Amino acid sequence: MWLQQRLKGLPGLLSSSWARRLLCLLGLLVLLLWFASSGARRAAGGLHLPSWARSEPGAAEPSACLEAATRAWRGLRDRGEAVPLGPGVPALVANGFLALDASNNRLWVTPGEREPAVTPDFVPFVQLRPLNVVAEAGEAVLLLREGLLRRVRCLQLGTPGSGPAAGVPGPASASGLSAGSGRDCVLLQEDFLAHRGRPHVYLQRIQLNNPTERVAALQTVGPTAGPVPKSFTSTLEKVGDHQFLLYSGRSTPLPSGLVHLVVVTSKKLVNRLQVAPKTQLDETVLWVVHISGPIHPQVLKSKGAKELKALQDLARKEMLELLEMPASELLQDHQYLWAQLFSPGVEMKRITDAHTPSGLTVNLTLYYMLSCSPAPLLSPSLSHREREQMEATLNYEDHCFSGHATMHAENLWPGQLSSVQQILQLADLWKLTLQKRGCKGLVKVGAPGILQGMVLSFGGLQFTENHLQFQADPEVLHNSYALHGIRYKNDHINLAVLVDAEGKPYLHVSLESRGQPVKIYACEAGCLHDPVELTSEPGGHTFSVMVTQPITPLLYISTDLTHLQDLRHTLHLKAILAHDEHMAQQDPGLPFLFWFSVASLITLFHLFLFKLIYNEYCGPGAKPLFRSKEDPSV
């Protein structure tokens, strides 16, 4: 009863101003004390884990380890050179002959240029299963400039019998280390790649850093999951000090009934990898894949043995050659060739509409197309004569790329790809598009030519007999982008579409000299001004965007100065306008029907108003404007 009376009197107490001030002061004091106590706890105890991490010992340590191990990826992601794996980003590593899905552990082999990819019943990569692990965190990323997939896993070792694989005895279980070191993490890094210079080779690099006080152990499963597939047989080959496994078999029959013979050699790996405390492990597993052409099952019995032996001899020879090489040299060779191949490209600087692909989409598409395209020019077995012929084809001024730009072709620059099979179909579509647009010579060269054609097509660049012309649509120049590494004669040209502070687009051209210097000139649309000689100065050269009537290319680049000077007399133009003037003519404002409707409504309103006034003062029964004095109502 007493408490009820006091509660009834509480609103009256708070109605006074001094009571409200006192209550606010007390609340502020409580907040200050809480912040001071939490700061003291942080200063005294260092980093405090969240409650969920403290309730599960060690749950946050792998995450912190992973954050430190992948910190260098942030800058690469910002520059569009690294793409985390996830939905819409298949884990593909390929070199035009081999294609491997690292996530689903599948292998595709392309027997020939016009033949579809074959999927042998063979699991390509080694699977690593850590022993005695109580917590784990991992992340994978495609490194576009290195041509590989990198997967990082941080493993927290537990006491023997606490991990998911505790039922498997081994040295790690017998280490007898105390639980006090269970909060340390082991860093496992795997690199997956299909070698760019050796089309039959793919590899998996395993690096394990064990800073703990206990032995770290990994169970290896592979290269086939479980027993060898029924379509394959395996033998252990011993040559000198080297041992490797030889797998022989056939692919699944094609719809036509034809089959392919497949031979795979693999470096032999122990069943369990062990890393002593405070040490590191660096192991590279190599594979060599050879495949025959399509064979009819009836012919397989008579010619199959001879064909299979020839494939086995090729695979043995290449595997022995690889085993004599340092693994680091093989990796460095791949990274160098891939960086050289990926030097041209497209850089998206500013996007103002929803139909233009993002920089991530462009770089990922270029990576996938390079991965699915062979590069015979990079093969070490290529003869000097064949190399010269391919270089001449690559530098030939073909009529590539004819037609409109592909910048807004969503089927060529898809925002998401769901599977490796979809990537292979996209590669076929790109090759067909380039061949139909005058780029047959570039497609024939392989990956360098296909990349050149894709860069040309993105911006609407086209080679003619005498010059290189930039024929982009003037209406899409509100997007800023740069095209790098365009081959012209012995030099590389960089062309960028930029926007100034007032929102007006302009062109920036720079030159990278390669080999014998050649004079190159450029002039904007119509060549109204004298051509400018392009040099390799760091600042480059800028050109204003001029639009002609009728529309012609926005920029001409040529080694023939006289040809550019003659263009102004042979184009036969009606007018040459600045870009903003052209856009003003293209978009004069609201349509005529709108203004006609507004004028009609205004006219009708005034006619209606005039009718009201007329009926009021001049119509039947209208009141007089002025009243006389004799009016009795006055």
UniProtKB/Swiss-Prot annotation:
GO terms for cellular component: membrane. InterPro entries: K2013-like. The keyword Glycoprotein applies. This is Uncharacterized protein KIAA2013. The chain crosses the membrane at residues 590-610. Residues 1-40 form the signal peptide. Pfam families: DUF2152 (PF10222). Keywords: Glycoprotein, Membrane, Signal, Transmembrane, Transmembrane helix. Residues 611-634 are cytoplasmic. It is a single-pass type I membrane protein. Glycans are attached at residue 363. Its main location: membrane. It comes from the Eukaryota. It is found in: Membrane. Residues 41-589 are extracellular. The keyword 4Fe-4S does not apply.
